[in-house]
């Protein structure tokens, strides 16, 4: 008896014979002596042959030799039959009950249960553009940074420069892994000389905290920085729309004059009678907006007070779906949707935030290489389908020369503001120039044409609204 018996465990027929000679002449002992049947197949492929060889080596028949105990599954089954519920903590905002009482449809966003919409996402978008909307942002990751070396840490983990951020200002930043791949983004505000508040993506809060601690504990243990996670310590909300300043002025003692509290600024004060609230002026939706962080136990109170104060201003809540449409209209990317595990900063259109002139930072060597490519890489661009009523599914492939896959649609929606289809896509450099025509393959195999836009923003590319 010669030849391989169990390819996965590298067992030959002669190994079974050797087992019998050594006294391991029962089916279970021979199995363990040789490891035959202990690989991925768990004996389904080889054990019948193994027992036949053992029977021959011990001068018995197969029936009296017996077989090993079969391990489940006995017969092939689909992985779907084995898949169970993902056991993760379900986290909710302090305002969750209010959302349910007012018709919110839930969606799962990482570990969080969040309002997807309140019945009509398109109407929610229109209301934000025309009046004022309010959204629950509690899942937004929040990290408190204290210490004289915070700026060193920010310069290390972000691609842009943090040396000149003044107290009372906030700055958008992008984090890259050491291979230059975009791993998270967010806004960090300077609350005091050595005091900063960092926000991250909702799904990236834990990973960013780990990332900061990794650098502090393994590379720079001498730096004086204390990082405290505050995601659930604050209830966060954003009011957005042309009436948002008037609304906030009715419930706060903070001076909202745009000359003193301009775009990308932060202030601390009282909101709806609650002290020590942090308010910063940023614009993910593309509208004049204020992001408010209040102690979690007061979240529902502040939320309801804002709704009461804004009744004559047309205030209404909006959910994640409306927010995604609004940000797409503005051309703002979402890390993890408009990027993937290979997207580097320049490919995501974030080259303006990469400051290669500063000291070493995470991802710098790889980004230096990409910068020398002079744009010869994939690009994130805005595209419009020739048919304004056709919304290509996200992840639809972009092809050229027949069937060569060269890109994909990363985000797509029907814009209630523009009343047409709008998309973001990754395309090669040859197709990234404004006016380029690209071919999108739909799920049914149909092909449609789209045109690359000059600007990522479909609405207010000059930023007049959010800076108003």
PLM-predicted stretches and their roles:
Residues 96, 100, 114, 192-468:
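Conserved, structured C-terminal
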Residues 161-194, 198-215:
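Well-ordered mid-protein domain cores that form the structural environment of catalytic cofactors
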Residues 137-148, 189-197, 237-239:
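N-terminal glycine-rich flavin-associated loop
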Residues 33, 49, 53-176, 181-183:
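Acidic, proline/glycine-enriched N-terminal capping motif
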Residues 27-34, 132-135, 284, 376:
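Short acidic (Asp/Glu) and glycine-rich catalytic loops that position anionic groups and cofactors
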Residues 16-21, 141-144, 189, 290-291, ...:
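Short, well-ordered beta-strand elements within core beta-sheets of diverse protein domains
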Residues 1-70:
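C-terminal catalytic lobe of FAD-dependent flavoproteins
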């Amino acid at each position: 008896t010669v030849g391989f018996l169990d390819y996965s465990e590298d067992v030959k027929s002669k190994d079974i014979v050797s087992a019998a000679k050594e006294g391991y002449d029962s089916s279970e002992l021979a199995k363990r002596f040789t490891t035959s049947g202990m690989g991925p197949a768990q004996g389904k492929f080889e054990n019948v042959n193994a027992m036949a060889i053992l029977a021959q080596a011990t001068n018995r028949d197969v029936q009296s030799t017996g077989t090993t105990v079969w391990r489940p599954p006995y017969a092939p089954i689909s992985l779907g039959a084995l898949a169970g519920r993902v056991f993760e903590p379900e986290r909710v905002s302090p305002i969750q009950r209010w959302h349910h009482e007012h018709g919110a449809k839930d969606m799962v966003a990482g570990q969080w249960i969040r309002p997807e919409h309140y019945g009509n996402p398109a109407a929610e978008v229109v209301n934000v553009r025309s009046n004022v909307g309010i959204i629950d942002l509690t899942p937004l990751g929040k990290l408190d940074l204290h210490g004289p070396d915070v700026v060193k840490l920010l310069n290390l983990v972000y691609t842009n420069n943090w040396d000149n951020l003044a107290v009372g200002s906030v700055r958008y930043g992008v984090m890259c892994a050491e291979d230059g791949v975009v791993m998270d983004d967010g806004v960090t505000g300077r609350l005091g000389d050595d005091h900063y508040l960092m926000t991250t993506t909702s799904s990236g809060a834990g990973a960013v905290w780990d990332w900061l601690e990794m650098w502090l504990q393994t590379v720079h243990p001498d730096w004086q920085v204390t990082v405290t996670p505050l995601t659930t310590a604050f209830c966060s909300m954003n009011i957005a729309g042309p009436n948002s300043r008037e609304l906030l002025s009715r419930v706060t003692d903070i001076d909202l004059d745009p000359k003193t509290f301009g775009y990308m600024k932060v202030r601390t004060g009282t909101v709806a009678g609650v002290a020590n609230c942090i308010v910063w002026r940023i614009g993910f939706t593309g509208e004049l907006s204020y992001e408010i962080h209040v102690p979690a136990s007061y979240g529902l109170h502040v939320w309801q007070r804002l709704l009461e104060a804004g009744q004559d201003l047309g205030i209404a809540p909006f959910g994640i779906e409306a927010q995604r449409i609004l940000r797409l209209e503005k051309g703002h990317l979402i890390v993890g949707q408009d990027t993937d595990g290979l997207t580097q900063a320049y490919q995501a259109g974030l080259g303006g935030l990469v400051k290669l002139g500063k000291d070493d930072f995470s991802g710098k060597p790889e980004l230096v290489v990409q910068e020398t490519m002079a744009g010869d890489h994939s690009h994130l661009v805005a595209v419009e389908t020739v048919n304004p009523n056709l919304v290509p599914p996200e992840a639809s492939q972009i092809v050229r020369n027949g069937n060569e896959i060269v890109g994909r649609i990363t985000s797509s929606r029907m814009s209630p503001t523009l009343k047409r289809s709008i998309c973001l896509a990754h395309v090669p450099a040859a197709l990234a120039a404004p006016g380029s025509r690209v071919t999108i393959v739909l799920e049914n195999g149909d092909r449609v044409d789209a045109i690359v836009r000059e600007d990522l923003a479909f609405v207010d590319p000059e930023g007049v609204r959010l800076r108003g």
